[in-house]
A protein has these predicted regions:
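Aromatic (Trp/Tyr/Phe) and Gly/Pro-enriched flexible surface segments
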Residues: 20-173
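Bacterial Sec-dependent N-terminal signal peptides
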Residues: 1-25
Protein backbone atom coordinates (compact mmCIF):
# COMPACT_ATOMS: atom_id res chain seq x y z
CA UNK A 1 0.00 0.00 0.00
CA UNK A 2 1.80 3.07 -1.25
CA UNK A 3 1.14 6.35 0.50
CA UNK A 4 2.32 9.75 -0.52
CA UNK A 5 3.37 12.06 2.24
CA UNK A 6 3.46 15.76 1.66
CA UNK A 7 4.91 17.96 4.35
CA UNK A 8 4.31 21.66 4.17
CA UNK A 9 5.27 24.23 6.66
CA UNK A 10 4.47 27.87 6.48
CA UNK A 11 5.29 30.39 9.11
CA UNK A 12 7.87 28.56 11.12
CA UNK A 13 9.21 31.72 12.55
CA UNK A 14 11.40 31.25 15.56
CA UNK A 15 11.64 29.39 18.76
CA UNK A 16 12.37 31.37 21.89
CA UNK A 17 15.96 32.56 22.06
CA UNK A 18 16.24 30.48 25.22
CA UNK A 19 15.73 27.28 23.27
CA UNK A 20 19.17 27.43 21.68
CA UNK A 21 18.67 24.59 19.26
CA UNK A 22 21.27 24.10 16.57
CA UNK A 23 20.45 23.77 12.88
CA UNK A 24 22.18 21.94 10.04
CA UNK A 25 21.62 22.92 6.42
CA UNK A 26 24.16 20.48 4.97
CA UNK A 27 21.86 17.46 4.54
CA UNK A 28 20.09 16.75 1.27
CA UNK A 29 16.33 16.28 1.23
CA UNK A 30 16.91 12.55 0.75
CA UNK A 31 19.18 12.44 3.83
CA UNK A 32 16.65 14.40 5.90
CA UNK A 33 13.89 11.91 5.15
CA UNK A 34 16.03 8.75 5.40
CA UNK A 35 18.25 9.68 8.35
CA UNK A 36 16.15 12.11 10.39
CA UNK A 37 12.43 11.59 9.74
CA UNK A 38 12.11 7.87 8.93
CA UNK A 39 14.57 6.27 11.30
CA UNK A 40 15.33 2.57 11.31
CA UNK A 41 13.68 -0.04 9.17
CA UNK A 42 10.03 0.95 9.64
CA UNK A 43 9.28 1.99 6.05
CA UNK A 44 10.42 1.88 2.46
CA UNK A 45 10.87 5.44 1.20
CA UNK A 46 10.89 6.50 -2.47
CA UNK A 47 10.63 9.60 -4.65
CA UNK A 48 11.87 12.11 -2.09
CA UNK A 49 11.65 15.67 -3.39
CA UNK A 50 11.39 19.28 -2.32
CA UNK A 51 9.48 20.89 -5.18
CA UNK A 52 9.28 24.27 -3.44
CA UNK A 53 11.71 25.99 -1.07
CA UNK A 54 13.91 29.09 -0.91
CA UNK A 55 16.42 27.56 -3.38
CA UNK A 56 13.81 27.75 -6.15
CA UNK A 57 13.59 31.50 -5.60
CA UNK A 58 17.39 31.80 -5.71
CA UNK A 59 17.49 33.61 -2.38
CA UNK A 60 20.82 32.25 -1.18
CA UNK A 61 19.59 30.72 2.06
CA UNK A 62 18.15 27.36 3.08
CA UNK A 63 14.55 27.07 4.26
CA UNK A 64 14.90 23.42 5.33
CA UNK A 65 17.36 21.33 7.28
CA UNK A 66 17.81 19.36 10.47
CA UNK A 67 17.79 20.57 14.05
CA UNK A 68 19.31 19.29 17.29
CA UNK A 69 17.57 20.17 20.54
CA UNK A 70 19.57 17.94 22.90
CA UNK A 71 21.71 20.76 24.30
CA UNK A 72 18.99 23.39 24.68
CA UNK A 73 18.20 25.14 27.94
CA UNK A 74 15.42 24.99 28.88
CA UNK A 75 14.84 21.57 27.41
CA UNK A 76 13.40 21.69 23.90
CA UNK A 77 10.43 19.34 23.35
CA UNK A 78 12.23 17.28 20.67
CA UNK A 79 15.77 15.88 20.59
CA UNK A 80 15.98 16.56 16.87
CA UNK A 81 14.15 16.50 13.59
CA UNK A 82 13.49 18.28 10.34
CA UNK A 83 12.92 22.01 10.26
CA UNK A 84 10.93 23.67 7.48
CA UNK A 85 10.77 27.45 7.49
CA UNK A 86 9.51 30.47 5.59
CA UNK A 87 12.90 32.09 6.05
CA UNK A 88 16.48 30.95 6.44
CA UNK A 89 16.80 28.21 9.06
CA UNK A 90 19.94 29.92 10.37
CA UNK A 91 17.62 32.55 11.92
CA UNK A 92 15.64 30.02 13.95
CA UNK A 93 17.92 29.32 16.96
CA UNK A 94 18.23 32.94 18.05
CA UNK A 95 15.09 34.45 16.59
CA UNK A 96 14.49 36.65 13.61
CA UNK A 97 15.73 40.21 14.13
CA UNK A 98 12.85 41.53 12.03
CA UNK A 99 9.72 40.32 10.27
CA UNK A 100 11.37 40.22 6.84
CA UNK A 101 13.01 36.80 6.96
CA UNK A 102 10.98 35.62 3.99
CA UNK A 103 11.68 38.66 1.86
CA UNK A 104 11.60 38.61 -1.02
CA UNK A 105 8.78 36.07 -0.94
CA UNK A 106 8.74 32.94 -3.04
CA UNK A 107 5.77 30.92 -4.26
CA UNK A 108 3.17 29.26 -2.08
CA UNK A 109 1.52 25.88 -2.60
CA UNK A 110 -1.63 25.14 -4.60
CA UNK A 111 -2.52 22.07 -2.50
CA UNK A 112 -2.46 24.11 0.69
CA UNK A 113 -4.31 27.01 -0.94
CA UNK A 114 -7.11 24.55 -1.74
CA UNK A 115 -7.29 23.44 1.91
CA UNK A 116 -7.41 26.85 3.59
CA UNK A 117 -9.67 29.85 3.08
CA UNK A 118 -6.97 32.48 2.84
CA UNK A 119 -7.93 35.19 0.33
CA UNK A 120 -4.31 36.05 -0.45
CA UNK A 121 -3.25 32.42 -0.83
CA UNK A 122 0.05 31.19 0.54
CA UNK A 123 3.64 32.16 -0.04
CA UNK A 124 7.10 31.07 1.10
CA UNK A 125 6.25 27.38 0.87
CA UNK A 126 8.84 24.89 2.01
CA UNK A 127 7.74 21.43 0.94
CA UNK A 128 9.14 17.96 1.41
CA UNK A 129 7.22 15.14 -0.19
CA UNK A 130 7.87 11.45 -0.55
CA UNK A 131 6.21 8.10 -1.00
CA UNK A 132 6.48 5.49 1.69
CA UNK A 133 5.32 1.98 2.40
CA UNK A 134 5.20 1.32 6.15
CA UNK A 135 6.32 -2.03 7.50
CA UNK A 136 4.27 -1.54 10.66
CA UNK A 137 0.54 -1.20 11.37
CA UNK A 138 0.77 2.25 12.91
CA UNK A 139 2.81 5.38 12.17
CA UNK A 140 3.13 8.63 14.07
CA UNK A 141 4.83 11.97 13.58
CA UNK A 142 5.41 14.67 16.18
CA UNK A 143 5.49 18.28 15.03
CA UNK A 144 5.64 21.79 16.39
CA UNK A 145 4.42 24.91 14.59
CA UNK A 146 6.02 28.12 15.77
CA UNK A 147 5.55 31.65 14.51
CA UNK A 148 7.22 34.92 15.34
CA UNK A 149 4.72 36.75 13.13
CA UNK A 150 1.60 35.97 15.13
CA UNK A 151 1.47 39.00 17.46
CA UNK A 152 2.35 41.41 14.64
CA UNK A 153 0.26 40.06 11.76
CA UNK A 154 -2.90 38.70 13.43
CA UNK A 155 -5.67 38.29 10.82
CA UNK A 156 -3.26 39.34 8.06
CA UNK A 157 -1.36 36.13 7.33
CA UNK A 158 -2.28 32.53 8.10
CA UNK A 159 0.75 30.65 9.39
CA UNK A 160 -0.11 27.19 8.18
CA UNK A 161 1.21 23.67 8.44
CA UNK A 162 -0.21 20.70 6.58
CA UNK A 163 0.66 17.05 6.87
CA UNK A 164 -1.13 15.48 3.93
CA UNK A 165 -1.44 11.73 3.46
CA UNK A 166 -2.90 10.38 0.25
CA UNK A 167 -2.99 7.09 -1.54
CA UNK A 168 -4.89 3.81 -1.74
CA UNK A 169 -7.13 3.22 1.25
CA UNK A 170 -6.80 6.77 2.57
CA UNK A 171 -9.92 8.91 2.40
CA UNK A 172 -9.73 12.69 2.15
CA UNK A 173 -9.98 14.13 5.63
Amino acid sequence: MKRILLLLLFGLGVFSAQSQITVDNTLTVQQLVDDVLVLGQCAEVNNVASPMNSDFAGLGFDSFGAFDGTTSTPVFPFDGGIILATNGIDMVPTGMPNQNGGNPPWLGDADLDALISEPNGTNNATIIEFEFIPFVDQISFNYLLASDEYPTFVCTFADTFAFILSGPGISDV
